[in-house]
């Protein structure tokens, strides 16, 4: 290996990558006998072909000659190739011939030459002389090659010529292999880095690099040729830093200046196609700093005035770039590696590293070998990163501290890899001094093998070494050897980490802790053991035996993972849990699945949960998905349905075991009891005649700092989160089915006495909330929040347990007893693959509508902090933004007048608020603004409908007005097909709807009017979102159906829903309103067969019959078989097909244009003065175009009147605020005012269509202006509605 490299530097010094022989004919003088004939052989071999054709041959024939495979089309090259091939074949056939090599080769060459020349060169004396000259040169080259052949290659019985040529070929290949660093550039000529480089002269390069070298006196620049490996340029500072003259570096190989152990690191880190290009955009303040941090390589460069005796190496940080440099004016530009070299000083010498910044990290294997070392360790320890890689960790520790590593690894195993602090250890620096460091350790547990894959260490220097220059070479001493104690400790640690981790800590690095046996462990953050003694306490758990593993597998396959999880994670007795707060990380603290605790236990449980919520999760999204995929595999096991039913009836919402079978049944729990909290929020009909207050705790302060706010985003599948594909997930995100009771800050305190009647909060500011378009930033932020929510909630996996017999006993419909335990949350992680019916119902007073744990406080809510990135929480229940559409609402007495208070911003993501504006407001009865709320004892009476604001309450639709069968979907995106696994629960034909406050449309049925509160509750429950998958799925259907009637949503796509903002639609019908109030019992299909534009001409004649048949159809599918059995036996009304019906685009657009033309009559008419005034403020009015905030293809909601705090400063929306159109809308204008919904028939309804359709005419833009104005002015409408009705 060394032979070719040595030869590369001697004997004329041919440069790799160039032509080996420049002259074409080597000197016939006495050859030099050297131990390495590599380059000389290459020169001679190259001469074999170069000399044959004169100047026509360039370096390509050298490779062909050396490989004996050159078949050139030219005659000269063909002859030379034939000569070599004939010589080779003749000598190989006569390999046993002992004839002298010279005579045999001469004979072969002459014969081959005569054979080749006879037919083609007769009569040409010039060609004959050329051939003779070529033959002579070839014989000379072969003779020289044979002289350079080592004696070991001259075997007996072998042809000398063949052996010589084979050895020459091997040497050429060896040289190419050793210089692969240079050959990479020629192989990567097609790479972009080779094409986009600028060419610099030496003067230009010196001028550019001086910008960096002059600012830092410890920096110099050097350019190394990729073709030769030699230095073509070096700055003046190099002589000062390396203590030698600058001329010493001229023409020297840069690799010769590096320390031998750093050469390979340098070559591996400076491959040309991996380097950034040095361009004009690189500046000293920006680009260089970034590349220095990411692309730097550490090497030691030799320096000193006399480099022969004991060379001294200085550590440098090299930042490589690739560029082209023209050495002289006539020379071609050659690619070079430009290096910015910065001298590394000890971190303890001036300029010192601040003590609080002396931190670095390491990673080592279970066998205690360094796997990765932070580059920040170089100035602190004196070692370059490559010095420690692969070295034993124990070798660098103080002998007295080495036993601590065994204790550290024991604690890592006990804590399942969770980070913890440990006592200081002493680490040996390069100069032989010891550095005292405070250490923190953590381990990565492999999600499948459950073993510690590697150990992470974070080290902070506490005490600097006595000799502050850590780069000083230590005194000569025998090389440190692995002592017997180091080997023994390494073996013990390795055997220890071979054991699988069985800790039950809920937040292990890979999330496997919750599946293990619940052993009480110390808190991961406990660092009370100053000397590591605590790690010796509880030894590592006994490994699971093979018999136990087989038993577990058998249990999972034949009896279900439900029973397996319960058998493996059976919780300890309750008193033990409350008595030992230290065992918090491994105990199951989910009060959702436990018996109702005693009142005196509430503060303790709340404190425990608060402490647990403060734990930092060290999981990563990909690690959690590894485990979740295993869980989903276990859930997919085919388990007998009888066993699964038994599990379903005895356990509610088990995160790690609820399978698809469980999603289809809720056991004996009645329909009214198994309400989803989300549907409860929307159930305004049952809440109106409430006569008993909800029993629950008071609200605790909102604390949103430790959990992503999007965890509680309500029905994210209706927002743009439905377009986000969760990695490794085939289920909807958890936030789709987790309501605001999952928020940590919403854990109620001690259960108080029955709360007084809810009070009304004042109306919010007109611009307190504003819909936001789907932007890249919002989408990215929401994705990050969803992933963070997924991580923060996955640690709750181990706190799940089955219900006790008391909590599993079915109760009367709508009646649940016992107070709400503190901290009640649905820990249905595993990415929402949970039963939608398994949401445990909220504890509430008998025969009362169940609500999430946050109950109306006696006083108004304080405004949330302004720093909250997302809205804080759903507004208090008695939020009477609008009066009932049914008619005049009698004002109840105001027993407790309340001072004005601002509404908190709703806890939903911006896009959820955009798509579901009505979801922001709960459903108790309607009351006017500014008045205290009292229970309404009578339902709203039928009367003519007053104009409705933009946030229209949901009210039942009369049976005579059919709805569109196209948008009956609970999902706005085909990416969430699994959201629609379970069809909606039965709905009565004229049943109540979970609508807005006091929602009613026309006279209610006599049975409903005379029903008791409990019966009314059952009706509300049956008409609610019974599947518990999406709290606002029916709301979305109503919005989409109204939009399908308005006919202006043809441009919207399915991912955002085609009815965004259609909630602003309203109309006045004497028989009942149909704009945004479609009864839930009128759903004909419950599934969407179409996600594109809305067919405005879709026939709706079959909707009434479908509404009548729906109750019987859906009842069959609520509490029975799993979804795949349902799909096999279901009829067309239940099946999800996603088949886009064939439609004529021209006809659809024509109908939409006709509707737009009819809606133009309802638009405001501006005079010329008004237009000038508007044009002075809004430029888009002058241009006759839509404003930028509205000129989007996606649907931008205009139905909400409360501004989003996160986008309150958006100039696009502030531009729309200035366009006040309230007088026009309230007055009705022509056609009754489209914005106010005062028109008759569908006119007012159409006027409220969403503005997602792109229109080009100025009249269409004026229509959108009026709609946006209606949105902004909507808060002023409700009071006027009451007065008018």
UniProtKB/Swiss-Prot annotation:
One of its GO terms (molecular function) is transcription cis-regulatory region binding. A motif (Nuclear export signal 3) lies at residues 975-982. A motif (LXXLL) lies at residues 1036-1040. The gene is PER1. It comes from Spalax judaei (Judean Mountains blind mole rat). SMART domains: PAS. Residues 1142-1285 are annotated as: CRY binding domain. This is Period circadian protein homolog 1. Pfam families: bHLH_PER, PAS_3, Per3-like_PAS-A, Period_C. The modification Phosphoserine is found at residues 122, 126, 657, 659, 700, 811, 972-973. Residues 422-465 form the PAC domain.
